[in-house]
């Protein structure tokens, strides 16, 4: 790109801490986006999303959140459980209550318990404390807001019904993708021009991506995020994941073509 950028300023952002959801907010706080009009990102895709050698113009990431539920009951000897409030029993019903929440079935949403911990220190003791961790996802940001409200209500009301104290905390939220259609089409055209029409794949879904914090912090920012098929298998984040490095230049070519057209 040296010598090709003749209009404006090009920033190459190598953002840390994406997995902890702290990287993008740190970039925002540092003022990196203050003078930015367009933000374009990319990520390799697993074989299930995009075939090797193909590129999708938009990765439709969902909103994601981690919700921590703490249940406080009353300990008792297991021979006299009626004298206590068994927080494992409460946890089972809390998980069931969350699973019983129904949102629009035509949309994308899910909540699943990924951790549960309770240990009174003995096998014959009713535990007075239990914690649950939920992984929560939704296809749209307003849907996520409603989902979290319903989850909070389900947890708290279940606790009251069983005479336990339940607190719900969702400290971090990764927003869903909100793209600008005209910019996505420009990315699609760059894919056609560099990789060929036959290698433009349909949009794919995805996990969470804190790139979308940029748009949430600066709504006027035009954003797009494409996915490069590199044959990643068995999937992203798998400890035994492998992918074909020969396809990485496909993503580079899209970036270069887009920047040259936009700023050359």
Pin down the residues of each PLM region.
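Structural signal for the C-terminal ends of transmembrane alpha-helices
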Residues: 1-2, 263
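Histidine/acidic-residue-rich, glycine-tolerant segments that coordinate divalent metal ions
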Residues: 2-115, 122-125
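Metal-dependent amide/peptide-bond hydrolase catalytic core
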Residues: 88-264
